[in-house]
Amino acid sequence: MLRRTLLASAAAFAGLTGAAVAQDDPLKVGFVYVGPVGDGGWTYEHHQGLLAVEEHFGDAVETVFVESVPEGPDAERVMTQMALEGADLIFTTSFGYMDPTINVAAQFPDVRFEHATGFKTADNVSNYSARFYEGRAVQGHIAGQMTESNIIGYIASFPIPEVIRGINSAYLHAKEVNPDVEFKIIWAYTWFDPAKEAEAANTLIEQGADFILQHTDSTAPQAAAEAANEAGATVYTFGQASDMIEFAPAPRVSSIIDNWAPYYIDRTQAVIDGSWETVSTWDGMDTGMVEIGEITDAVPAEIKASAEEMIAAITAGDYHPFTGPINRQDGSAWLADGETAADYGNEGIAGMNFYVEGLTAEVPQ
């Protein structure tokens, strides 16, 4: 029978470094979530990965998870408890879990840790993320052509490179097809807070936005747009992190789907067979870690076709969303004509902390 618990009672713990797990000894895999599993977005999709691990491995694994864990000291406490209770592999699924993950991993050298969206590693800590900015390019391409008000609203979470990259990518591709487009950005300073997210969406709609993009985790912006449409407005959205298909065909006209399941299965298998090692993974459409949800018929056929061409080009590696010429917001050159951005280094997108030319807001400091 498949074994799964929220937090099991204390159990004996045996180190597994460099050795495969015995066939009759289930591997205990833990997941730490920043939101509830029912958030409909970020955490929901990570939990789908957990369920895929269970389905793939059956009785060979036991999974545990804790949801709605704040970033900071609480996260460190939860990770410590998981390790003490026998977890062999722990996935920590929010950027703000980075330092807690490193701290706890140092205390449990025989436990493997996998941290999502961060950049630090250790002998027993890997990190992984997805190239969400690829999906943002598609969203900008669609929104820029469909907007009637020329105002696109963006609900941002925290001013970290991952979020700034997404804003820049969406803006560049909206501007490419619509030189008159304007982005209005609201920083929510939260990953998951439906009330704040709804308030941000409503504010943007009041400011004239007829497209709402989000880098927050709940479906509240979708519901806010739906309510606005019922009141006579025309507002469109994109599902974030998960398909959010319940809001299709409108306001949700497509989505970015984070597909973590293959990665979770692969890393779990590596621990089982003794081949786990520290890696940094940053995958995108090419591997299927980033997927684009169905583009609905609310999108005109010619726009849908051009968006699908962009998806195919990014997936094949024929197009990079950050291809020059691109200037920084202050007008200084960043990428020359035809030059594609590096991942790392002083000019790389991994540490992106600036807006591109044309965005009028300021990056919060």
Predicted ranges, named:
Residues 2-7:
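N-terminal export leaders
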Residues 8-15:
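Bacterial N-terminal signal peptides
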Residues 23-365:
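A residue-level marker of the well-folded mature domains of exported/periplasmic proteins
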Residues 17-22:
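Sec/Tat signal peptide C-region and signal peptidase I cleavage site
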